[in-house]
């Protein structure tokens, strides 16, 4: 979503890239969508997504890009072996690519004098705040643990698949509400997960990155954990720059969700956010989620080649979300100031340009 947002009033450096904006029209509207209340997701899937199952409403203003996980660590190199004339060579494919992770945060300003924005607050924002408080209302919402411990977790993917919204309506507004429509393109969208669409001739749509199963070897995946720097095809173009995905992720079975699901939060059984759903493999059998926090070591033992913390930062992470939270004095930063746990307070004494 952050890559498709072209808001000329966005924060620097996201608002202007000459060749990018010359080729693409700016974003003119932005909408939030959700399932209507009291409808069972599974039943909706079996009903092939009736048009009344999802509703959406346009915001009065376009969002801004608060944070993207770009240039967040030093570039990690990985050499691929190959044979030529029976000689073995090593090829480093990534020396010119900027590191990136599939994680971004958008900021949306609401004008509560606007009826549509007030409805968004009532029906989208307030329920999210309520859920956040029920989960602890604290920095402890974001999981961090040794990579090997994730294999014992149960993972819950939040968010919603894309469904057609041509004839649905959210709330009656006197002035009317211009809603985003996906049109006929998604009229035959496949269902939620593979187990719900068995027998369907359509395997479903994949998100914006595809990974080859040929690279799922012992060097790239171990007990459900993947090291993105080993993936030859994990390249991303964002605002006219070439990036490659780095860091660590989860490999999740039966999670080839339809396009639009990328960016959904992944929780574990402890109700903590561990990662962001990213993409599916070419075979549609395995999905990936980008881990947000990977500790440098556990009990003094190094467990990763490169640690990073996209939320709170650490000595190895150059850009992280808490930098924006500190600059804007957000609620998260006030929670960081209250905490005595050093894993959250890295940003407090840091000075930024």
From Swiss-Prot:
Organismal lineage: Bacteria, Bacillati, Mycoplasmatota, Mycoplasmoidales, Mycoplasmoidaceae
Family membership: Belongs to the MG067/MG068/MG395 family.
Recorded GO MF terms: ATP binding; RNA binding; RNA helicase activity
Pfam families in the cross-refs: Peptidase_S7
Species assigned in the record: Mycoplasma pneumoniae (strain ATCC 29342 / M129 / Subtype 1) (Mycoplasmoides pneumoniae)
Name of the protein described by the UniProt record: Uncharacterized protein MPN_591
